[in-house]
From Swiss-Prot:
GO terms for molecular function: G protein-coupled receptor activity; olfactory receptor activity. The lineage of its organism: Eukaryota, Metazoa, Chordata, Craniata, Vertebrata. Residues 50-57, 121-139, 220-235, 290-307 are cytoplasmic. Glycans are attached at residue 5. Keywords: Cell membrane, Disulfide bond, G-protein coupled receptor, Glycoprotein, Membrane, Olfaction, Receptor, Sensory transduction, Transducer, Transmembrane, Transmembrane helix. It is found in: Cell membrane. Residues 1-25, 80-100, 159-195, 259-269 are extracellular. This is Olfactory receptor 4N2.
Amino acid sequence: MESENRTVIREFILLGLTQSQDIQLLVFVLVLIFYFIILPGNFLIIFTIKSDPGLTAPLYFFLGNLAFLDASYSFIVAPRMLVDFLSAKKIISYRGCITQLFFLHFLGGGEGLLLVVMAFDRYIAICRPLHYPTVMNPRTCYAMMLALWLGGFVHSIIQVVLILRLPFCGPNQLDNFFCDVPQVIKLACTDTFVVELLMVFNSGLMTLLCFLGLLASYAVILCRIRGSSSEAKNKAMSTCITHIIVIFFMFGPGIFIYTRPFRAFPADKVVSLFHTVIFPLLNPVIYTLRNQEVKASMKKVFNKHIA
């Protein structure tokens, strides 16, 4: 009987971002504009870093991977959301929901760990400059990338396995525009207290610890560069401030969503929209606009291949 109950729910009905047609149209247009303008910019960042021999430092290697992660992350939720805006009934299969949830946490977890790696890179570059070539050699950089991909995979697998073990026998309406843990787990027809604790530990605690660790590391870096020369200080300050902005934009919504009991709050959908759609598109752009070397290289690539 338990096995049958687990297979009763074969699809979920997404209630969407809002029931207002005017707001749906506005969000549809804004997200579409973001896609057509900023998403190609992310791929331009990747192409620029790959094609310019002058951008071989570990910072640019990680920035290229960040752009790739964000471009991939933006394909998980936004395209389906745009299609659903045009549909009267928004339905996602059980398997499709689990797949979306897996990639959401796989790429999101990997990106959070990548920001930790980038903070470590900046710490070594600014606080231990003489050791930088030795510590941040290509082999170490590739090992770090492999570790963060593996970390994101393990984090996501834990989320998915916990969901798959739950029976779903109705109702099947998800009060959101995509599948995520807080909404899906509430539809399980069993007590989920222990599972929620495990998920808060897996997602929320990891997010919070990474956030606090990143803030502490950049605080150390900022204290260290106070006595530097004016030019070096300004460049280091610019890089650190950019990273801190991205940290708040990424981890702020994550902490709000995953470090509390899985209850519905009025701001949930707006925070989720920013976290899953807007921020992944803007993230590499924020880095690029404050990096003179990347901007100069992008101009050369643009003039060479397009102008």
